[in-house]
Protein backbone atom coordinates (compact mmCIF):
# COMPACT_ATOMS: atom_id res chain seq x y z
CA UNK A 1 0.00 0.00 0.00
CA UNK A 2 0.84 3.69 -0.08
CA UNK A 3 1.76 3.68 3.61
CA UNK A 4 4.41 1.02 2.99
CA UNK A 5 5.98 3.19 0.29
CA UNK A 6 6.07 6.18 2.62
CA UNK A 7 7.72 4.12 5.36
CA UNK A 8 10.37 2.89 2.92
CA UNK A 9 11.08 6.44 1.73
CA UNK A 10 11.32 7.63 5.33
CA UNK A 11 13.94 4.97 6.08
CA UNK A 12 15.98 5.94 3.00
CA UNK A 13 15.71 9.63 3.85
CA UNK A 14 16.85 8.90 7.39
CA UNK A 15 19.97 7.14 6.13
CA UNK A 16 20.77 10.01 3.77
CA UNK A 17 20.32 12.59 6.52
CA UNK A 18 22.63 10.66 8.84
CA UNK A 19 25.32 10.53 6.15
CA UNK A 20 24.98 14.23 5.39
CA UNK A 21 24.97 15.13 9.09
CA UNK A 22 28.55 13.84 9.36
CA UNK A 23 29.70 16.50 6.89
CA UNK A 24 30.42 20.05 8.15
CA UNK A 25 27.63 22.48 7.32
CA UNK A 26 25.35 19.78 5.93
CA UNK A 27 23.00 19.96 8.91
CA UNK A 28 22.71 23.73 8.45
CA UNK A 29 21.91 23.29 4.77
CA UNK A 30 19.22 20.73 5.56
CA UNK A 31 17.60 23.07 8.08
CA UNK A 32 17.52 25.85 5.48
CA UNK A 33 15.90 23.52 2.94
CA UNK A 34 13.22 22.42 5.41
CA UNK A 35 12.16 25.98 6.15
Swiss-Prot record:
Q: Which residues carry this modification: Glutamine amide?
A: 35
What are the annotated disulfide bridges?
A: none
In the UniProt record, the signal sequence range is none
GO CC annotation: extracellular region
The tissues where this chain's protein is expressed are given as: Expressed by the venom gland.
Protein's cellular compartments: Secreted
Presence of the UniProt keyword Ribosomal protein in the record: no
GO molecular-function terms, A-Z: toxin activity
Q: Which UniProt keywords apply?
A: Amidation, Secreted, Toxin
Q: According to its UniProt record, which protein family does this protein belong to?
A: Belongs to the cationic peptide 04 (cupiennin) family. 02 subfamily.
This one is known as Cupiennin-2d
**Which organism is this protein's natural source?**
Cupiennius salei
